[in-house]
Amino acid sequence: MSLLVWGATLISGFIIVFALMPSLIRYFRARKEGQMIREEGPKWHEKKSGTPTMGGLLFIIAILVTTLWVGGWQHQLQPTTWILMFILVLYGALGFWDDSIKLWRKQNEGLKAWQKLLGQVIGAVILTLVYQHEHLPMALRIPGLGVWSLGIWYMLFAIIWLVGFSNAVNLTDGLDGLVAGQATIAFGAYAVIAYAQNQYNVMLFCLAVVGSLLGFFVYNHKPAKIFMGDMGSLALGGALAAVSILLHHELSLLLIGIIFVIETASVILQVASFKLTGKRIFLMSPIHHHFEMKGWSEWKIDIVFWSIGLVAAVISVATII
């Protein structure tokens, strides 16, 4: 596949988001609809209250449009392409519902935890059923141990993987530009892996995500003019997990998505420590807030986290290809 196709995919996603995002921002500002900031969050985040959210709506549309037209042009609209777009839309719709409730109620509480979990599980179950129908391998590739056939247990693993990483990306989305940058690195890494495996349809999807997120980053870096919302973070997390599954390099996501893993682990450790000992390990979790409390700027945290994520992604890609 030529560099022309790579470039067309990246540029298409970028231009759609870059050109249309100002209109979406103006729409939300005109309606005075913006993100409500959690009271228990860092006090200096209160100035972000009212910033338009649900920017994920536009980059999801850009990803879909780009994947469809480039995939159609290159005859790469295969079943796995539709699976990826389905997960992106379903998890995005769940986040849209959550964000809409927050905007309507003018508070930072949307769907109840069980409602969000139910939606995530339903989406994951549908993915596993389609996966099984396509006779894709129900096996897990474990570095150093080879490929392990899990049979029906692979479906349970896939469900946990999708739900876990969609929530992990959602937890990480607490600083301007952090998730947009890290997700760009992760999807870029999987684009390279997909290319090496001749899975060009998955590669095109990943490149569409990268281009769209770069367009979004123009408006999401500090100081953010718009947030991606749960709509964006849940969709990205679900799609990222689905990509790792369809490329049969599931566990590589632990390294390629190491920042999402660290952020989630910090929350789990914080809660467990407080429940067991009454003491907190971090000044605040997720861990990016801990560094904020230590006096780090958002830009410094972003750059350090992106650097860690980039190094981890390069190592992972190098060991796979």
UniProtKB/Swiss-Prot annotation:
What do the Gene Ontology cellular component annotations say? plasma membrane
Q: What is its EC number?
A: 2.7.8.13
Q: Which organism is it from?
A: Lactiplantibacillus plantarum (strain ATCC BAA-793 / NCIMB 8826 / WCFS1) (Lactobacillus plantarum)
> Could you identify this protein by its name?
Phospho-N-acetylmuramoyl-pentapeptide-transferase
Q: Report how it sits in the membrane.
A: Multi-pass membrane protein
- Which pathway is this protein engaged in? Cell wall biogenesis; peptidoglycan biosynthesis
Query: Where in the cell is the protein located?
Result: Cell membrane
This entry's Gene Ontology molecular function terms read: metal ion binding; phospho-N-acetylmuramoyl-pentapeptide-transferase activity
